[in-house]
Amino acid sequence: MNNLELEQLINQKLSSDKINDYAPNGLQVEGKTEIKKIITGVTASQALINYAISQNADAILVHHGYFWKSETPCIRGMKGKRIKALLVNDINLYGYHLPLDVHPELGNNAQLAKLLDIENLQPLEKGSVSIPVWGELKEPMTGKDFAEKIEKVLNRKPLICIENGPHLIRKIGICTGGGQGYIDLAAEQGCDAFITGEVSEQTIHSAREQGLYFFSAGHHATERYGIKALGEWLAKEYGFDVEFKDIDNPA
C-alpha cells in the first residue's frame, strides 16, 4: 500500500481529524512510497528505529512520535539522530497520540480495560471526546486483589494507594499514560478506584481524602496495547507484515 494511503486509512479508523492534540497525528517523517513491513511500538526511540532498520521495515507506527508543541523545533541532538536514521533508511514514521488513547475498540483505555476485565466503558468527561473513561469490573474485588491482577496482567508491580477505598471495587476510572490529573474527576463521578500510568505527589492525597483506591501501573505498561491492537488490525484487515516490538521502559 502507498504510504499516503496508509495514513488516510488510519486517520479514518481513528477519527484523527475530530480530536485536538498537542502533537501531529499521522505521517510525521516520510520515507519510501510502498509499505509492506511495519514495526509498531510505544515510542519512536532510537532503539525502536534501530530494530526497524535491522528488520528492513518500511514503516514504524507508534503512540509517542515527534514534534510535540512544547518541544524545540530544532532538528539536532537526540531528535536529530533519530530523524536522520529514519531518512537515511527511507523509513516512514507514523504517530497517533490521543486518537489512539480514546478509540472505543483499539484505544489504550479500551485495550487495558479488556485485559483487566472491565466492562461497559463510559466517558468521564462531558463533551464529544473524553480522554478518561469509567467502567465496571466484571467481578468486584478488593483493592489488594485488583493490584495483584494488574501485576499479573501487565507484568509490572503497580504503585498503589488502597488505604481509604470501599471494601470492593465495582466502578473504576481509567486513563492510560499520564492521566493522574483525572483522579478528582473520577472521585466526583463516584468511582471506587482509578487506574492510570503515572503518579504525582498530590495524587495520593486525592485518593486518601476522597476515599477511592488508586493504582499507578506505568506509563509505558498501560500504553503498550493500543498500538499493538492497531497493528494487528492492519495485519488482519489489509495483509501487512506487522510486528510489535516492546522496548522495555520501567516508567
Curated annotation (Swiss-Prot):
Record keywords: Metal-binding
Disulfide bond sites: none
Pfam families: DUF34_NIF3 (PF01784)
Binding site for a divalent metal cation 2: 64, 219, 223
This protein's GO CC annotations: cytoplasm
Binding site residues for a divalent metal cation 1: 63, 101, 223
GO molecular function: metal ion binding
Family: Belongs to the GTP cyclohydrolase I type 2/NIF3 family.
Assembly description: Toroid-shaped homohexamer. In the hexamer, 3 dimers assemble to form a ring-like structure surrounding a central hole.
Name of the molecule in the record: GTP cyclohydrolase 1 type 2 homolog
